[in-house]
Curated annotation (Swiss-Prot):
This is Pantetheinase. GO terms for biological process: acute inflammatory response; cell-cell adhesion; chronic inflammatory response; coenzyme A catabolic process; inflammatory response; innate immune response; pantothenate metabolic process; positive regulation of oxidative stress-induced intrinsic apoptotic signaling pathway. Residues 492-513 form a propeptide. It comes from Homo sapiens. It comes from the Eukaryota.
């Protein structure tokens, strides 16, 4: 015979559990200037590898301690923060540890060597325990295999780019193997199936993924759509790509588009355009850092709602499909944005209404500039196609952007500064997806928190005049279901393919990704 829990006991337990939960929490992210290994593909000894990792951990320890002293409940550190990059499979191996499944119920700080030599995990565990703070870190996992596994690599092991989470008692509570490896990241293996990793705290439910994962459906969208996490923790080593994929720009837009908190911790390496960390709420950025001028790390802290209220679902095509095309009479022209061919129309005058279309996507813009600055040109652009450079992903993008120069051929080139402020803007598009990420980026890679919002009918519009000159106002849409559709044509031009080999390949080789 089964027994049921008395109703009054169940109700009591419910209220006790609610009382033990926090409505808000303090989050920290640390942008780390990693100490890198020597540029050699010859494996070093385990002792040399540990020496380098401990130098980086010494710096991370300072950030973790400082965050805890300021009341942080959780801190996120970057991808590659502990050992850097410049590896092949063999040269990475001395830096790896066997990271067990968190179900083993293990506090490495209390039970050393339970799973072999694991000094990095032990140190991270002790940092979490001794400071009573959740610690999110990125390290490398190794898993032996043999011929009984038909997918076993020739060297007899799997190597994974891995995120780990230790709770405030030092317990290993999450392990995530990166699914979407960046081009050239061949020192690692892809897990056989995408891993959906969550962990629960008294200040909300969390999901975790890494860097390039953010551009794909799994695990990123699944964590929010199906597992309903409150907050994403995001270790990354992100190279900024303007105009649409600057770290602070895109990560804050993803938080707003998916309506979750987002804790992004980036490597600080300005010579490779790697900077940009932030703490983002669904309605606005709370703290962010972008610094191309110094070589120093940066700790950010901010308070967030543990369970952010979910705003109304946006119908991204509602407004745009209800209005007629806003004919400007201006001639359309083509321009390349990160190797994709956009259709543009030049903005003329201090105010106006414009429409530009490509394939199934029509973009509508209404705007008013604070003043017309003669040596600056802005354009409205549309792209509806498959991006195939460093990855394969289908995009629909509506963008108002500053051209690099007054030459229209530079519309879409990377522009980092501007002088034109806008009194108002309203941007919308006939998107074929519910996954649209709203971006507003000001001059010198600054965000505009509290200056814009998205309406339920799909308009990205200003709430006040911009506080700084505008680089871009963008609706960045992803059609995940078309990433591998046979009829999806690439937006990459033949000229862009040549440029890709010239520009992208050396960067990848220099990072050994």
């Amino acid at each position: 015979m089964t027994t049921q829990l008395p109703a009054y006991v169940a109700i009591l337990l419910f209220y006790v559990s609610r009382a033990s939960c926090q409505d808000t929490f303090t989050a920290a992210v640390y942008e780390h200037a990693a100490i890198l290994p020597n540029a050699t593909l010859t494996p070093v000894s385990r002792e040399e590898a540990l020496a380098l990792m401990n130098r980086n951990l010494d710096i991370l320890e300072g950030a973790i301690t400082s965050a805890a002293d300021q009341g942080a409940h959780i801190i996120v550190t970057p991808e590659d923060a502990i050992y850097g990059w410049n590896f092949n499979r063999d040269s990475l191996y001395p830096y790896l540890e066997d990271i067990p499944d968190p179900e083993v119920n293990w506090i490495p700080c209390n039970n050393r060597n339970r799973f072999g030599q694991t000094p990095v995990q032990e140190r991270l565990s002790c940092l979490a325990k001794n400071n009573s703070i959740y610690v999110v870190a990125n390290i490398g996992d190794k898993k032996p295999c043999d011929t009984s596994d038909p997918q076993c690599p020739p060297d007899g092991r799997y190597q994974y780019n891995t995120d780990v989470v230790f709770d405030s008692q030092g317990k290993l509570v999450a392990r995530y193997h990166k699914q979407n490896l960046f081009m050239g990241e061949n020192q690692f293996n892809v897990p056989k199936e995408p891993e959906i990793v969550t962990f629960n705290t008294t200040f909300g439910s969390f999901g975790i993924f890494t860097c390039f994962d953010i551009l794909f459906h799994d695990p990123a969208v699944t964590l929010v759509k199906d597992f309903h996490v409150d907050t994403i923790v995001f270790p990354t080593a992100w190279m900024n790509v303007l105009p649409h994929l600057s770290a602070v720009e895109f990560h804050s837009a993803w938080a707003m588009g998916m309506r979750v908190n987002f804790l992004a911790s980036n490597i600080h390496y300005p010579s490779k355009k790697m900077t940009g960390s932030g703490i983002y709420a669904p309605n606005s950025s709370r703290a962010f850092h972008y610094d191309m001028k110094t070589e120093e790390g940066k700790l950010l802290l901010s308070q967030l709602d543990s369970h952010p209220s979910h705003s109304a679902v946006v119908n991204w095509t509602s407004y745009a499909s209800s209005i007629e095309a806003l004919s400007s009479g201006n001639k359309e022209f083509k321009g390349t944005v990160f190797f994709d061919e956009f259709t543009f129309v030049k903005l003329t005058g201090v105010a106006g209404n414009y429409t530009v279309c490509q394939k199934d996507l029509c973009c509508h813009l209404s705007y008013k500039m604070s003043e017309n600055i003669p040596n600056e040109v802005y354009a409205l652009g549309a792209f509806d196609g498959l991006h195939t450079v460093e990855g394969r992903y289908y995009l629909q993008i509506c963008t108002l952007l500053k051209c690099k120069t007054t030459n229209l051929n530079t519309c879409g080139d990377s522009a980092e500064t501007a002088s034109t402020r806008f009194e108002m803007f309203s941007l919308s598009g006939t998107f074929g997806t519910q996954y649209v990420f709203p971006e507003v980026l000001l001059s010198e890679n600054q965000l505009a928190p509290g200056e814009f919002q998205v309406s339920t009918d799909g308009r990205l519009f200003s709430l006040k005049p911009t506080s700084g000159p505008v680089l871009t106002v963008t609706l960045f849409g992803r059609l995940y279901e078309k990433d591998w559709a046979s009829n999806a044509s690439s937006g990459l031009t033949a000229q862009a393919r040549i440029i890709m080999l010239i520009v992208i390949a050396p960067i990848v080789c220099s990072l050994s990704w």
